[in-house]
Structure formats: C-alpha cells, structure tokens
Amino acid sequence: MENLTQNVNETKVDLGQEKEKEASQEEEHATAAKETIIDIPAACSSSSNSSSYDTDCSTASSTCCTRQGEHIYMQREAIPATPLPESEDIGLLKYVHRQHWPWFILVISIIEIAIFAYDRYTMPAQNFGLPVPIPSDSVLVYRPDRRLQVWRFFSYMFLHANWFHLGFNIVIQLFFGIPLEVMHGTARIGVIYMAGVFAGSLGTSVVDSEVFLVGASGGVYALLAAHLANITLNYAHMKSASTQLGSVVIFVSCDLGYALYTQYFDGSAFAKGPQVSYIAHLTGALAGLTIGFLVLKNFGHREYEQLIWWLALGVYCAFTVFAIVFNLINTVTAQLMEEQGEVITQHLLHDLGVS
C-alpha cells in the first residue's frame, strides 16, 4: 500500500511538472508571437476554417503559420544573409572612391604656359610681327630635316604659335583631361597624351614631310578620342555618357568648322597665320582611341571587348612601325641623295676647272 501511494504521488508530481512546462511553453510562444507578428493575414487569426487558414497562410509573404492547440502563431522565416555577388556594379564601386589627383594634366599645362611666356619674354623684337614668331632653329620645333633628333617628335608640344593657339589647347585639355585622369589615373592619361603627341609628329612626317610642327593638338585630340574609348568600354556604368559624347562631337565639329572657315573663307590677316595640321589632329585622335582601349580601366568585361583590345593593339602597332620605318628610309635616302649630289657637284666643278 505504501508503494502504491508513493507511485500515485510521483505520477501527480510528473503531471504537474508537465502542465507547468506546457504553460511556460505557451507563454513563450505568446511572447514570441507578439514580437514577430507583422501584418498577420486575417485568415491566420481565425481558427474556424482550417482550409481557409492553410490557403491564406501559404500565401503570406516570408511568414509561416503554425497551430498549437487552440492558438495560432505567426512567425517570420529566418532569411539567411547571402553575400552580394561579384557583379560589374560592385567592381565599379571599387573605383568610385579611389579618385586620382590630376597631376599630369595640371603639370603639363603649367609647363606649356611657362615655356610660351619665356619665349615671348626672350623673343627678339623683330619676331613679334611674324605669323609664327617662333624661330625655326629652336631645339624644340619638329623639323623634317632633323628627324634623327628624336626628342623633336615630342618637344614640339611645348611651343605654340600665339596666345589663342595656347589658350585653346590648354582649356580643352583641362576640360576633357581632368575627368579622365581623376577616374583612370595619372599614368594612363600620361601615356595617352604622349602617344597622341608622338603620333601627331609621326603622321605629319609621313603625309606632310616638309612641314614644321608646333603645338599640343595631337595630345589634345588624343584625350578627346580617349573619351570615346571610355564611353565604349564603360557606357553601361556611366550616368553622363551621352553628355560626354555630345560634348566631344560638338567640340570637334566647331574646331573643324572654324579651321575650314579661316582657311577657305576668311581673308583677314589672322586667317593668313599658321595653318592647322589636320594630319596631326587625325593621327593624334587615332592614337588616343587605340591606346585608350588598351590602357583605360574597364569596369565591365564583355567578350567582344577582348576583340576590340587586340584590334586596337594591332592598328596602333602597325601605324607606328610603318611610320618609323618610313622615316628611317626617308632620312637615309635623303642623306644618300645629298651626298651623291655633292659628289656630282664636285665633279662638275672639277670638269669646268673651278676649284
């Protein structure tokens, strides 16, 4: 009897503990429901219609309905935090906050202004009335008869015919060069600018082989063409691509129209000044476009852009190699003809009895 009484008491204790446990669980669920329920559907709050409950609760966005006894609890599903994919936009954001100070464009502009001012200050008085007051024997002028002085293919960019020529190039290279350098960096823009300058003198040496050359227009047009390369590579990631393209087209159109007007329709003394080297502009732009495809940052790689890269490399290398070989052959030929001419002249003078 004592054992039976003890078993009954233990059973009562167990039942009491289970009831207390169930009560505590219900309180916990009720508290959790208050904290997690957000915009509970009407069907989820009604327990009278089971089919309606199942249908409506299954359509609740990112929620889960459960029954426990007489109560219905709404709990949000745990949505795992998935890492963002390495998309093109994320690749672009890596560069947005890494902007570069435009050292190259600012420094090259200051140097060009300083050299122009120095030339004007030290210029002989008789040169001020000339259309191009720069002396032809300057060590910076590109001269076709001194092609072996290789620095002249670059140094001519520091000289300008007049204040208008200088100011025009400075304004344009600041306006178009600074945004490119801020985004793509000093080294890339420096390479593009110098490639345009070099291409300008190379192209002139091939097409207008007797022309002297001054001015930084080859580098300026390289920057303009680099904008086209940048737009082609990163159009989908640029907010003002159409505006940039329009500004380049407007500038080139105005510059070309002004050059044609002054050459063919304007009879003023200003129009009779130094002629514009269209070849330097064109070859500078070609260099800027091809080198731009090669060195500018590409924020979204696509399959066809690899083909553009190789095509640009091939075009630039072919043009450069052809121009260099042409200059070497032309220079050697000219020297041989000059030496042969001197020999022939000496023979003629000897035959005529003139020492």
Swiss-Prot record:
Spell out the Gene3D superfamilies in the cross-references: Rhomboid-like
For the Cytoplasmic compartment, the record's topological domain ranges are: 1-98, 184-188, 232-244, 297-308
Ranges for the region named Disordered are: 1-34
- The catalytic activity of this protein is classed by the Enzyme Commission as 3.4.21.105
Its annotated compartments are: Golgi apparatus membrane
One MF term in the entry's GO annotations: serine-type endopeptidase activity
- Give me the reactions it catalyses: Cleaves type-1 transmembrane domains using a catalytic dyad composed of serine and histidine that are contributed by different transmembrane domains
Coiled-coil region(s) at which residues? none
Membrane topology term reads:
Multi-pass membrane protein
GO CC annotations, alphabetized? apical part of cell; cytoplasm; Golgi apparatus; Golgi membrane; late endosome membrane; membrane
Please list every transmembrane segment annotated in the UniProt record, as residue ranges. 99-119, 163-183, 189-209, 211-231, 245-265, 276-296, 309-329
- SUPFAM superfamilies cross-referenced by the UniProt entry: Rhomboid-like (SSF144091)
Compositionally biased spans, kind Basic and acidic residues: 11-32
Please give a single GO biological process term from the UniProt record. Answer: protein processing
InterPro entries linked: Peptidase_S54_rhomboid_dom, Peptidase_S54_rhomboid_met, Rhomboid-like_sf, Rhomboid_IM_Serine_Proteases
Which terms are listed as keywords in the entry? Developmental protein, Golgi apparatus, Hydrolase, Membrane, Protease, Serine protease, Transmembrane, Transmembrane helix
Topological region Lumenal: 120-162, 210, 266-275, 330-355
Q: Where is the composition biased (Polar residues)?
A: 1-10
Active site per database record: S217, H281
Report the enzyme's class at the first EC level. Answer: hydrolase
Instruction: Give the main location.
Output: Golgi
Q: Which family does it belong to?
A: Belongs to the peptidase S54 family.
- Family annotation (PANTHER family): PROTEIN RHOMBOID-RELATED (PTHR45840:SF2), RHOMBOID-RELATED PROTEIN (PTHR45840)
What role does it play? Answer: Acts early in embryonic development to establish position along the dorsoventral axis and then again later to specify the fate of neuronal precursor cells. Involved in EGF receptor signaling; cleaves Spitz to release the active growth factor.
Q: Report what the protein is called.
A: Protein rhomboid
Q: Which gene encodes it?
A: rho
